[in-house]
């Protein structure tokens, strides 16, 4: 089943995601983006156009930057209004989860597959503390 991807964020974060996806995976041109609030132009028509473009035999994924933020709320409202059960919304998106969904081997995305991708893509703390044993190596 074909997947259509939209990344909608406050400011130009979506454009940054698209650039990174192009560099890392050559997939930037396949992704639609909405950079909300960078001008006075209402982004709702772009959102509605994406939602309407997802056919019954396709799946759509909308990534948003902040759960409960205005972009996320608008996406949820428009998907519910369109009654499209084949469109998923993933909020608090990061580059890792977008890559995971794009390269998913699942022919049909399921809630479980998306939750697994989210869990694998969690933010990680990289430990930068030097252990005391390392200091002894210098003497």
Question: Residue locations for each model-derived region?
Answer:
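N-terminal loops that bind phosphate or other acidic moieties
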Residues: 2-64, 68-139
